[in-house]
Amino acid sequence: MALSSAKEIIDDIRQGRMVILMDDESRENEGDLIIASEMVTPEAINFMATHGRGLICLTLSKARCKTLNLPLMVQGNNDNFSTPFTISIEAAKYVTTGISASDRAKTVLAAVAPNAKSTDIVMPGHIFPLMAQDGGVLIRAGHTEAGCDVARLAGLEPSSVIVEILNEDGSMARRPQLEIFAEKHGLKLGTIADLIEYRTQQESHIERISEYELNTEYGIFTLVTYRDTIDNQAHFALCKGEIQAKAATLVRVHVKDTLKDILQVGLSQWSLEAAMQRIQTEDGVLVIISQQESPKTLFEKLDMYAKEQPNSPHSGIVQSRNIGLGSQILADLGVKKIRLLSNSNQGYRALSGFGLEVVEYIYD
């Protein structure tokens, strides 16, 4: 089955139709049913519950979550994919038990109404909101962000109802099963990777500011500076040698961390110094992502390191943001194939949407 383009997916969303989105073209991908929230009906909710079989969720922007006064379900999210659940919700009026398809549709419509306010919903309930990251799939390549993006690009409220598609035996449906499902129900099947590519052709959340020759303790690098247009943070790329699209480039994406970079606390295999030394020797690119570190966050990290706990506060959400920003910077520099200096073998979703491919992981 041929995949539908992002434009075709967006056109169907605009017309109130349901679509299926996978991460990318891999046969191992999972898929979600997606429909724009303001187009939802009891029939759509019933279809999702009957045929999708997963957890029916509502993707919302941070701004909408703030309007509805929705708190995150947990503050320190250590889930592998940093799924940002808020407390579940119910419409405050015109519902009974809240679980019926009709009641859930009413809850969705109450939450995304143009004049919606916090008193229009109660907590907990039978609809599970997900808070999307600002910047959408260019920052986090997840179905939460994709749900908001496709609705926004269709000219609708940036919110969708989504549900994972399961097989009849309860296992996750992969691409072969998703193709059969899409053909059976007459639904378009697309990818988040294609949505990323579609958006990068029209917009970016990084702006190249300047370029310098920089003499460091580890040799001379070309320093390229960037500005993040979402939160105005400054990010950097230290480049050594010529970047060639056909050749794999040695890459490290490093997140600025006061305790690790200055106090040398909780160092991983690829510290900032180790990465600079390796790239100075072999040529490549070191991307340095800035992040806001409040005193509270620093104290929490210090306490974590003292207790020898492996995960930092909000590590999953932060990592997703860093992957999106790092990918945009690498694409801007002309990198295509990556030899990644990595501390883990965790795969990265939908990099193909940025025109990137990891061909090798280097651990030491």
UniProtKB/Swiss-Prot annotation:
Site residues by UniProt (Essential for catalytic activity): H126, E164
Catalysed reaction, written as an equation: D-ribulose 5-phosphate = (2S)-2-hydroxy-3-oxobutyl phosphate + formate + H(+)
Highest taxon above the source species: Bacteria
Keyword Transcription regulation: no
Cofactor note: Binds 2 divalent metal cations per subunit. Magnesium or manganese.
Binding residues annotated for Mg(2+) 2, in chain numbering: E28, H143
Binding site for Mg(2+) 1: E28
Key word Cell division present: no
InterPro entries according to UniProt: DHBP_synth_RibB-like_a/b_dom, DHBP_synthase_RibB, GTP_cyclohydro_II, RibA-like_sf
GO molecular function: 3,4-dihydroxy-2-butanone-4-phosphate synthase activity; GTP cyclohydrolase II activity; magnesium ion binding; manganese ion binding
Region: GTP cyclohydrolase II-like, residue numbers: 202-364
Single Gene Ontology BP annotation: riboflavin biosynthetic process
EC nos: 4.1.99.12
SUPFAM superfamilies found in the cross-reference section: RibA-like, YrdC/RibB
Amino acids binding D-ribulose 5-phosphate: R27, E28, D32, R140, A141, G142, H143, T144, E164
Family: In the N-terminal section; belongs to the DHBP synthase family. In the C-terminal section; belongs to the GTP cyclohydrolase II family.
Function text: Catalyzes the conversion of D-ribulose 5-phosphate to formate and 3,4-dihydroxy-2-butanone 4-phosphate.
Protein name from the UniProt record: 3,4-dihydroxy-2-butanone 4-phosphate synthase
Organism field: Photobacterium leiognathi
Origin organism lineage: Bacteria, Pseudomonadati, Pseudomonadota, Gammaproteobacteria, Vibrionales
Gene this protein is translated from: ribB
